[in-house]
């Protein structure tokens, strides 16, 4: 089995995530895409981060209905910072007959050399990279150039930052997130001003 690992804060998961995951799955013939919400992302500030149980629940609602997508809680179940290399070690030990690939935005690839143990990550899995607005097109560090495949996913100007800002401003987020996620955000009153 070939599986794409799609990690992120998913704060919240939105339709661009869905489009990227499906395009990557189709283009590279992946059997499944495992969505991995980061419990404690090392490169993101926690000031706007919804509680991990909310982000996990929203991600589950995002993938329902697509049998090739599943949510993997490996980082949620682990204490401490969510380092990709540790996630790969665990998943490769648990699933020795599965071929994994790491799905990354081009913005993440731009700073990949700064990640925790990037050489080990590159030894463990190939990268499938999708373009993010404003990111550099090429691999910044030549050590990783042979491990990168590029996805032909459309560049979508939707981000979790935009969704949260619209929500704080009292504006609609309909069609930016799946309807089940929008309902969850409303029910749990997420991303509202704290004043």
Swiss-Prot record:
<keyword id="KW-0067">ATP-binding</keyword>
<dbReference type="GO" id="GO:0009435">
    <property type="term" value="P:NAD biosynthetic process"/>
</dbReference>
<dbReference type="InterPro" id="IPR005248">
    <property type="entry name" value="NadD/NMNAT"/>
</dbReference>
<keyword id="KW-0808">Transferase</keyword>
<comment type="similarity">
    <text>Belongs to the NadD family.</text>
</comment>
<comment type="function">
    <text>Catalyzes the reversible adenylation of nicotinate mononucleotide (NaMN) to nicotinic acid adenine dinucleotide (NaAD).</text>
</comment>
<keyword id="KW-0548">Nucleotidyltransferase</keyword>
<dbReference type="Pfam" id="PF01467">
    <property type="entry name" value="CTP_transf_like"/>
</dbReference>
<dbReference type="InterPro" id="IPR014729">
    <property type="entry name" value="Rossmann-like_a/b/a_fold"/>
</dbReference>
<keyword id="KW-0520">NAD</keyword>
<protein>
    <recommendedName>
        <fullName>Probable nicotinate-nucleotide adenylyltransferase</fullName>
        <ecNumber>2.7.7.18</ecNumber>
    </recommendedName>
</protein>
<keyword id="KW-0547">Nucleotide-binding</keyword>
<dbReference type="GO" id="GO:0005524">
    <property type="term" value="F:ATP binding"/>
</dbReference>
<keyword id="KW-0662">Pyridine nucleotide biosynthesis</keyword>
<dbReference type="GO" id="GO:0004515">
    <property type="term" value="F:nicotinate-nucleotide adenylyltransferase activity"/>
</dbReference>
<dbReference type="InterPro" id="IPR004821">
    <property type="entry name" value="Cyt_trans-like"/>
</dbReference>
<comment type="pathway">
    <text>Cofactor biosynthesis; NAD(+) biosynthesis; deamido-NAD(+) from nicotinate D-ribonucleotide: step 1/1.</text>
</comment>
